[in-house]
Curated annotation (Swiss-Prot):
The active site is at residue 182. Is synthesized initially as an inactive proenzyme. Formation of the active enzyme involves a self-maturation process in which the active site pyruvoyl group is generated from an internal serine residue via an autocatalytic post-translational modification. Two non-identical subunits are generated from the proenzyme in this reaction, and the pyruvate is formed at the N-terminus of the alpha chain, which is derived from the carboxyl end of the proenzyme. It is a peripheral membrane protein. The gene is psd. This is Phosphatidylserine decarboxylase proenzyme. It catalyses: a 1,2-diacyl-sn-glycero-3-phospho-L-serine + H(+) = a 1,2-diacyl-sn-glycero-3-phosphoethanolamine + CO2. The keyword DNA-binding does not apply.
Amino acid sequence: MNYPHPIIAREGWPFIAIAAVVALLIHFVAGFGIAWIFWLLLIFVVQFFRDPARPIPTQANAVLCPADGRIVAVETAHDPYANREALKISVFMNVFNVHSQRSPVDGAISKVEYFPGAYLNAAVDKASTENERNAIVIETASGATVTSVQIAGLIARRILCYVRAGEPLTRGQRYGFIRFGSRVDVYLPVGSRPRVSIGEKVSASSTILAEL
């Protein structure tokens, strides 16, 4: 199943509609002098749910960034979803980032696992293992295993994933969404070469995280 990708993410349509109706009603009843703050809220909701198309690098061994945000970890770690040692790269998304998730590589999904959990600040390391999360494990045609984990944050309370085990994914394909601040962890084979560093701002699909 392909993730729907209009300019404004479908997940945001109900929130945008509610914010627009409230702003219009208050504007009609009380005037712009009071309603302006609700118009600002509408603008914020629209920008939060934006979901623009992105250029996709064609480099064969590139692992693309699955989300917009800032790099908060580049380290060797255990991948509990594929049971291996791996290179872990983590992306933290604040409320101003685009919140759709996109596949980092071409491949077939071998596993999708959802885990209920806490709602700690997604920027801290223990969010990777304690927060609500959803992991997909992707097997590439070359035999590499890539794990992408959606992690809920302090404000985010709903992870959406639109793919299932056995389905194919193409690099840059939208496969999920997390509402209101979150994190994505990517686990790669040991020996992969990172192309990003901690603190760096990254963009979904257009930024290369690493080379396999």
